[in-house]
Structure formats: structure tokens, C-alpha cells
Amino acid sequence: MTIDTVILDIEGTICPISFVKSVLFPYFVKQLPTTLNTIQFPLNLNINDTNSNQASIVQTLSKLPLSVTTSSESTYNYLKGLVDNDVKDPVLKALQGLIWKQGYESGEIKSPVYPDSIDFIEKFPKREANCKIYIYSSGSINAQKLLFSHVDNGTGIAMDLNPQLSGYFDITTAGFKQEASSYTKIIDQIDKKDNEKSVLFLSDYINEVNAAIESGMNSYVVIREGNTPIPDKELASHKIIYSLSELNL
């Protein structure tokens, strides 16, 4: 069956794993104290300018346990702990997206998407009318859109790949990435329930690949420089690629 739908992981698949751990996470932790110091604690949810980034941050923080948001210090310590332990918390992910937005818009952050990935994202949707690319990441959908709207293509001017993408999924809209039910939910949402084999999911994390395969879709392991090595015995039964240019779809 011909593959006409590709779902892409981000970190370690289409951009270096170091981008998240060495650029995005540290930027968030560095900016967090300044951001929290501009907010009144206990939280005031009656901010008139509901379109402001600060209002969005306050609304997001209000979803944390009340015992956490008694002060800027306690809020910082709680969030820093989530980051340090790589906890896939939806409130943290939403807050990260809001703070990263400032970095992207100021030009401090640009997304180092691999050239082969840029090429694939630009060309695959143009092959046939039904060829589509979706993104599935633990990061919030807003953070995903920011990443793809500020891609470093080597010209010094950020490029926007969002027009080539048909949709986005995160842990709030699909579920956790190591659970087969999450991929089943995506299959339903993109109207591929009776055509799962026309869908391909790409990830550097073998547990995600296994979960995707269990749902009925195809899935390949992507190996990139700097990724955590996967034992050969775990890779033995999987299709492996080292670049999206290897895809013959």
C-alpha cells in the first residue's frame, strides 16, 4: 500500500536532540525567574488584556496545584524540577511554548531543522493532492508551530514550514507517545481508520516506534548523530533510516 501520510517526531528525528536539551530547555529555565517576577502571587486571574502573553502565562500557571503557586520561588522550584526530570507535564509544555515565543520573536532562537528534513517537508506534500505531513511531539502544539515558523535554513532569515504541514498533535490532543492508543487516536482524527498502512510515523525513540506499529501504522527508526544509541537486538526487526532523503515513498 502506498504511503501518503507521514507523521514526524521532532527532537532527534528532524532536528538535533541537542536543540531541545541545550538550547530550548536552558532558555526556558534562564527566562523563567524574570517572567515569574513580573507576576503577582497569589495569582490574579482578572487580567483585563486577555490577549497579552503575560495573561496567557498567568492562565497557564493557574492550572498548577495551588500549593505550588504561593510565590514566584515555589513556582520556579516546582517547574525547574519538572524540567530537570524531563517530566512530560502538559502545563509545563504550554508554559515553555509561551516563553520560547519571546525567544523566537526576538531572534534569539532559530530552529536547526536538518536540511534533508526541510527538503522533505517542502516537497512531499506537493507530490500528490492527498500527500500530507503531520507533527506529533510532546511539546505543545503552539511550541511546534513556533519551531516550524523560525527554521534556520542557512540564509540568516528564518523560514516558515507551517504552510506545508497539515496538522499537529501533542500529549493533550493525542496522548503520551509510548502508548499505542495515542496513535490510534491520531489515525481516527486524520481519517485513516481503515487505511492505517498508508501512514508512516518517524521517530528516533524505539518505544514510540513500537507503539505506532502496534496501532497498525508503519513506523521507522530514525538514527541521527548525537542520539542515544539503541541496542542492535532492539533494532533487528525495524526499518532504519539515517536521513529523510532515504525515504522512497
From Swiss-Prot:
Keyword Protein transport: no
Cofactor: how bound: Binds 1 Mg(2+) ion per subunit.
InterPro entries to which the protein is assigned, alphabetical: Enolase-ppase_E1, ENOPH1_eukaryotes, HAD-like_sf, HAD_sf
Family named by the database record: Belongs to the HAD-like hydrolase superfamily. MasA/MtnC family.
Binding site for substrate: S137, S138, K177
Organism of derivation: Lodderomyces elongisporus (strain ATCC 11503 / CBS 2605 / JCM 1781 / NBRC 1676 / NRRL YB-4239)
PANTHER family noted in UniProt: ENOLASE-PHOSPHATASE E1
Pfam (any one): Hydrolase
Name the UniProt record assigns to this protein: Enolase-phosphatase E1
Function: Bifunctional enzyme that catalyzes the enolization of 2,3-diketo-5-methylthiopentyl-1-phosphate (DK-MTP-1-P) into the intermediate 2-hydroxy-3-keto-5-methylthiopentenyl-1-phosphate (HK-MTPenyl-1-P), which is then dephosphorylated to form the acireductone 1,2-dihydroxy-3-keto-5-methylthiopentene (DHK-MTPene).
Chief location of this protein within or outside the cell: cytoplasm
Pathway: Amino-acid biosynthesis; L-methionine biosynthesis via salvage pathway; L-methionine from S-methyl-5-thio-alpha-D-ribose 1-phosphate: step 3/6; Amino-acid biosynthesis; L-methionine biosynthesis via salvage pathway; L-methionine from S-methyl-5-thio-alpha-D-ribose 1-phosphate: step 4/6
The protein's assembly and partners: Monomer.
Gene3D superfamilies for the chain: 1.10.720.60, HAD superfamily/HAD-like
Keyword rRNA-binding listed: no
Catalyzed chemical reaction(s): 5-methylsulfanyl-2,3-dioxopentyl phosphate + H2O = 1,2-dihydroxy-5-(methylsulfanyl)pent-1-en-3-one + phosphate
UniProt keyword annotations, A-Z: Amino-acid biosynthesis, Cytoplasm, Hydrolase, Magnesium, Metal-binding, Methionine biosynthesis, Nucleus
